[in-house]
Amino acid sequence: ISISDPSFLTCTANDFGYKSVFSRFVEANAVKNDLVLAITTSGNSENIIEVCKYCNLKGIKVISLTGKLNSPVSKISNCDICTPNGNYSDRVQELHGIIIHILVELVEKKLFA
């Protein structure tokens, strides 16, 4: 499930702060043995750190896509796929897009093969 509903994001940010927008959604919807894909170019995004912390408390696995080695998010993820590329965040995001396509293809093969 993509956490991208503008109404949810706006209401949650307004009521609880932007730091909690993703963790509140996961809290309401995820269960143990689910998997969260956390994507952050810097690896320092507070809202992504919060959702990773929540997942760790609840036994929810986290795969992170980051752009900096040893970032806070990479340290609290079960698996970090890091694409360090200096100060070029656009390159990191392009690589993340490719990785997401590969992950989707792998999941589809596993589910529908």
Language-model segment annotations:
Residues 1-113:
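Glycine-rich phosphate-binding loops that contact phosphosugars or nucleotide phosphates
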